[in-house]
Amino acid sequence: MGLLAYLLVILLILNVFFAAVTVFLERRDTSATWAWLLVLTFVPIFGFIIYLIFGRKLSGKKIFDWKGQEKIGIQESTANQIEMIRQKEFPFSDPNVKKHRDLIYLLLVNDGAILTQDNEVELFVDGHEKFDALIADIENAKDHIHLIYYIFHSDELGNRLMRVLERKAAEGLNVKIIYDAMGSRTTKKSFFRTFQKNGGLVRPFFPSKLPLINFRLNYRNHRKLAIIDGDVGYIGGFNIGDEYLGASKKFGYWRDTHLRVHGKAVYAMQTRFIMDWNSASSTHKIDYKARYFPTFHGKGHTSMQIVSSGPDSEWQQIKNGYIKMINAAKKTIYLQSPYFIPDASLLEAIKIAALSGVDVRVMIPNKPDHAFVYRATTNYAGELMETGAKIFIYDNGFIHAKTLVVDGEIASVGTANMDFRSFRLNFEVNAFIYEKQMVQKLEDAFLEDILKSYQLTPELYAKRSLWIKFKEAVSRLLSPIL
């Protein structure tokens, strides 16, 4: 055996040893561990390199700084709400909200998600309407504008928005942008040059410190938030790009869900932005000043909690909220997600609901955004059909909405998909809503989408080719790490 062969054997042995040690020492879900072991076994050496880039868990180093929040009373308010709910003394403004005390308590304890009850909420399901409203609010801003988007393209929509931001920065407003370094990888830094010259500040989230290599590549900031003057906020699924206006030939009409909020829930969005900004920026840190949390009384009646989650979290807060909602369902569960790859706990909760006679309807796209992810999605959908759940394929473009509506009484809207990535790897943010009128609008939007969909029946699903079945099997096997 030659020297090269000896070296190859040694490399293979080292690959297996270090791979096994690394994977098993990191605390992770069993299914993800097995998926990575398959990659490391069948793609030696290169598999370990892939693991180092995509598979490593975040270090124990604190990512977000919670200091300073005592200035605006967040910890005190959270503790007070927890105690009042525990003692059954919380002043719920709506009897319907009181019915969901357990879910509210869960999100308070897990995430410190304060319940606010004075919110005016406007629903957007079309990109043109959402961005027209956002740009109008930015035009009317008087003090500050804070934006965080996973994708910020330098196309027609991106330029339209940027021109307004440049002008507001030149007027002396405090304007800050966070974009995800991976999601916005095609956007050149020069796109922000005039904005920065005018006084605006921009930061990428988790950029690579080494050319072509990013050991935090797998951990992305998937949040989409806009906060204007501390009293108007936007949260939902729309990124910034022409495809979100239906301009993509591949996807066609883009169906998404976004909310405009005026009320105290905006405080939670502002807090989330400040934490993300201070994590992404080594300079120009934001303090919890009164200017970012103006005193006002919202005129709405929508009760809601803003819930964040990420790989730094002890608990998977958004997923836990989903499961709690599903377990509470008595009549209906309407779910939309472009990627439906639930873990065992979430899948089991949905199955039990369907088997218990709850009308479970899941809506997924009719075309792949990511090929492997789509085949895993159709495989899980096929399994869910066996329990009596109904699967609908959106056939009017691309469905990107991430919504869950239960019994026409509670709902969740935000950035988190129903998949492993959103629950374990991405930094996400969702609004949990407890007001029948607003929830009814979300339910109506879902039922309207059904009219633009076709049902995936067991007979139709059985007609899949052997090649499609093979792709589904492989994608399902690797789904914990997709």
Swiss-Prot record:
A molecular function (GO) term: cardiolipin synthase activity
Principal location class: membrane
Reaction catalyzed: 2 a 1,2-diacyl-sn-glycero-3-phospho-(1'-sn-glycerol) = a cardiolipin + glycerol
Domain PLD phosphodiesterase: 217-244, 395-422
Class of enzymatic activity (EC top level): transferase
GO process terms (BP): cardiolipin biosynthetic process
CC terms in the record's Gene Ontology section: plasma membrane
Protein's membrane topology: Multi-pass membrane protein
Pfam families named in the record: PLDc_2, PLDc_N
Active site per database record: H222, K224, D229, H400, K402, D407
Record key words, sorted: Cell membrane, Lipid biosynthesis, Lipid metabolism, Membrane, Phospholipid biosynthesis, Phospholipid metabolism, Repeat, Transferase, Transmembrane, Transmembrane helix
InterPro entries reported for this sequence: Cardiolipin_synth_Firmi (IPR030874), Cardiolipin_synthase (IPR022924), CLS_N (IPR027379), PLD-like_dom (IPR025202), PLipase_D/transphosphatidylase (IPR001736)
EC number(s) recorded for this UniProt protein: 2.7.8.-
Parts of the chain that traverse the membrane: 4-24, 34-54
Superkingdom field: Bacteria
Disulfide bonds: none
Subcellular location: Cell membrane
Role description: Catalyzes the reversible phosphatidyl group transfer from one phosphatidylglycerol molecule to another to form cardiolipin (CL) (diphosphatidylglycerol) and glycerol.
Record-stated family: Belongs to the phospholipase D family. Cardiolipin synthase subfamily.
Annotated protein name in UniProt: Cardiolipin synthase
Organism: Listeria monocytogenes serotype 4a (strain HCC23)
